[in-house]
Amino acid sequence: MVNLEPMHTEIKMSGDVADSTDTRSTFGQVEPGNDRNGLDFNRQIKTEDLGDSLQQTLSHRPCHLSQGPTMMPGNQMSGDMASLHPLQQLVLVPGHLQSVSQFLLSQTPPGQQGLQPNLLSFPQQQSTLLLPQTGPGLASQAVGRPGLSGSSLEPHLDAPQHLPGPKHLPGPGGNDEPTDLEELEKFAKTFKQRRIKLGFTQGDVGLAMGKLYGNDFSQTTISRFEALNLSFKNMCKLKPLLEKWLNDAESSPSDPSASTPSSYPTLSEVFGRKRKKRTSIETNIRLTLEKRFQDNPKPSSEEISMIAEQLSMEKEVVRVWFCNRRQKEKRINCPVATPVKPPIYNSRLVSPSGSLGPLSVPPVHSTMPGTVTSSCSPGNNSRPSSPGSGLHASSPTASQNNSKAAMNSSSSSSFNSSGSWYRWNHPTYLH
């Protein structure tokens, strides 16, 4: 602790010109070997009216600021300060820091005196740990430039005391969230396994929860819960309901006496939709049933009962197996049993009323007169079909029947109904 009693007697004077001269003489006594530094400090001193509150400031502040030089030797501070601005060469010896602190404290405005209780509230060990680390920086900020006022330098002196405080304290529930996520993941897996073991679908669970607890959930919601595809908040809300339903579902068939009569009538309705498990039949039993099916594909009820007793199976299982086997036999034998229908284009060739197409009649030559006359359109019913009639329509009956469809009264008018392809292919057509 630095003894400041000589300076107290000098600063308790009133704020006139005589006080300023006495203060200058005081600084001159503290620093007899540094006249230049004393002159620089005399230029920065401003005379102000110092009251009782300033005396309290002088009595408290030096104890915080004077601890920095005690922790750091003077040669280390001078080495750190050598690279700074030439105006910062004032603080080179521990004795200079005291004068600087006195100068800064003398410039403290009355508005910043409310910060003193906060500085006193910090323990002495904390300030001892902070000031050795921030000593050079604190000194360089305090004596930055001669033009800076004391009020602008005060926040730099107070800031290092607040830096080591933790900005974000870990909340008490920060470590619980991963645990909750792990618990939710485990519960979702166990819930899915137990639900399948009980034989319930996801839709059954949603309907059961709607009937029992009044909260309707869809099959999609249950599926997303099992897949961990819901938000953390919704999964936390859904977990106790699903856990309660699972406990009720497991305790209902095994211990019906433990349930209340008001709750489990609804449970029995829900459990009535319980899905049946898929029946797996062993290989030797399946071979025996195949032999019985080859002998009698449709056994009677008595025969089904007898087969079930022989194979130690349920009658309903044997009956369902025979039904499924008959359906399988129908699917296998269906294409072979039905007759093959003729193609559609064959019926056009056989039909007497069908029109002639390019594929139905081959090109007609003079050597095949019978084919042309017998396969003409139905409008030529009275046409003679004998080969001796010839290709040319010389008889009057043939010309009368073809008068509507004739384009001209030429010798080939009887074949106009056969289409343009016949006129082009006929040897008598003039190209």
Curated annotation (Swiss-Prot):
GO terms for cellular component: cytosol; nuclear body; nucleolus; nucleus; plasma membrane; transcription regulator complex. InterPro entries: HD, Homeobox_CS, Homeodomain-like_sf, Lambda_DNA-bd_dom_sf, POU, POU_dom, POU_domain_TF, TF_octamer. Keywords: DNA-binding, Homeobox, Nucleus, Transcription, Transcription regulation. Residues 176-250 form the POU-specific domain. Belongs to the POU transcription factor family. Class-2 subfamily. Interacts (via the POU domain) with POU2AF1 and POU2AF2 in a DNA-dependent manner; this interaction recruits POU2AF2 to chromatin and increases POU2F3 transactivation activity. This is POU domain, class 2, transcription factor 3. It comes from Mus musculus (Mouse).
